[in-house]
Amino acid sequence: MFTKKSRNIYKAGSLCEFAKAFFIGGIDVKNGVKHALPTEVQQLMERYTIELKEIFLDEKIVGVYIYGSIALGAFHAETSDVDFVTVISDSVNEAEKQQLVELHKKLSNSTLGKRMDGMYIPLADLGKYNDEMNEYVYCADGKADVGYWDINAVTWWTLKNQGITVTGKEAEDIPFQIRWNDVVNTMKYNVEQYWSEKAKQPYLFFIEEWVESAVVTMGRILYTLDHKTIVSKDSGLQYLLERSGEEWELLLQEVARIRQHPKEKRMLSRWRRADMTRKYLLHLIETCREKW
């Protein structure tokens, strides 16, 4: 739900543009702190928007928006994706599709360009879900294709309420509505279906990425249910560190190690870490169920 990483491993969603002088910026919804884009992301998006305007007429581009970890002020230069939504006035035609494929191929020559994940969504489809939409152009790991990508209530809520405007109409002003109850229902599905099923597959948690994904995603879900806003993976992990009992402290420190210092020695054996992760996941699932 929050992250595309777990799906990829197993193959297994309103901020004003306060100052043009910063090119783009955002707000930490918890603290009300303004964030400028990291320099390398700003440079990438400047190049992207210049080339995008060579493909689409100005009137076809409603806006380009950044969401995800960057908009939440939690960008990690080595690992963070550049999550974006480009809203256009109508569908992409065949010639434009080919030009977008070439654009992303060119941008993926850079390390950050390879981590662009996004969608080209017609204005009339804003707020809809994949089963209500025709196929659209999307970008995954810097490669453009046609099909369906990462759309759910969380996508739309973060775009509308926390999205950073790169160009065009302000994110908070784009014409669609998303209800908080829809976000909660997405969380509920994620907990009751996705993670409940993963908890039945304990072998998954011998893989480091699954340990990290399970813990930080459940931390984000729990924070969201408690505080009615979306936060980064880092904040989700910090929330668990602040509220969990001592019996989980070593596991949480191990997840922090995976995220921050992956080359350092493990704090737990693979067997113990996998067992603790599954038990903690089940504990967090029950905690979330008390909040529906």
Named regions from a protein language model:
Residues 66-104, 113-122:
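Catalytic metal-binding acidic patch
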Residues 28-64, 95-96, 292:
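Helical scaffold of the NTase/Pol beta-like nucleotidyltransferase catalytic core
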Residues 158-292:
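Conserved nucleotidyltransferase catalytic core and NTase-mimicking acidic/glycine-rich helix/loop elements
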Residues 40, 44, 99, 272, ...:
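Soluble or luminal CAZymes and related metallo-dependent hydrolases
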Residues 5-22:
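Positively charged N-terminal leader segments that act as targeting/secretion signals
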Residues 30-35, 86, 262-267:
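Glycine- and acidic
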Residues 31-34, 97, 102-208, 212-215, ...:
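Conserved NTP/Mg2+-binding pocket subregion across the NTase superfamily
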